[in-house]
């Protein structure tokens, strides 16, 4: 089924494919479902060409252990698929994998369709609140350019807010659909951001997962070791070099990676605070990295009066992720 609507004088077509969506596959509407067309990406963003290598399979790829290569791939994907003129982030800030972030947006679209007679709502009548928009502004980019949604992005970090603003100002297709707001008080998530006259269709969030800087470092080290094993397996010459911490691709500021109590405490705080804004936000949603936290999160949502609670699974190959959603209305 194809849904066609007019979005700010632009026709937006959303292809609702009938392909099955399992926990091991990307969403059927995810344009990254079939991998990276490197030749086309290099045409859209020539800088990527210097980072392209040949994998053991014979296919073109990049070295995912190199931050510059991953950043170039992200820029190419966002320019090629999402109509940007440019994309960049300051050094040391989170460089998110685009396909997984797109899955969250498509999962949200399906969630909103449940309240819209099974039809994905499109256009700027849908307004999303991105808690922690980051320097990359990845969710507003994908959501606005795929479905025409409007976004407000919040953050506590001045550099991140400046970067997100720069991205909007340098991309005419994004600028009218993204506004940023600073959270001045780290103790709050919604307070100070949601204004009395605001009404959001949904909120979304990629929370800080870890409890401390030490735990975040350990998690990054595990990823480094995993990349090292994969690189040695796929290296053609047998001269694979060890991947060390200073080659780490998993960048991110402290507020992007960890907070006191980790993701469980953060999401429970979000649930508690969401009660005050239940009439101004349709669906509250948040990514959850650890499945063992799900029961406690649902218990908290029910305790604070959520009438609906959902878990939406997402899959990118061997990686399984999910987001939770709750609302206070039937």
From Swiss-Prot:
S-S bridge residues: none
GO molecular function, one term: 23S rRNA (adenine(1618)-N(6))-methyltransferase activity
Protein name: Ribosomal RNA large subunit methyltransferase F
Biological process annotations from GO: rRNA base methylation
Keyword terms: Cytoplasm, Methyltransferase, rRNA processing, S-adenosyl-L-methionine, Transferase
Broadest EC class assigned to this enzyme: transferase
Purpose of the protein: Specifically methylates the adenine in position 1618 of 23S rRNA.
Localisation: Cytoplasm
NCBIfam families: PRK11727.1
Taxonomic lineage of the native organism: Bacteria, Pseudomonadati, Pseudomonadota, Gammaproteobacteria, Alteromonadales
Catalytic activity, EC: 2.1.1.181
GO cellular component, one term: cytoplasm
Catalytic activity: adenosine(1618) in 23S rRNA + S-adenosyl-L-methionine = N(6)-methyladenosine(1618) in 23S rRNA + S-adenosyl-L-homocysteine + H(+)
Family: Belongs to the methyltransferase superfamily. METTL16/RlmF family.
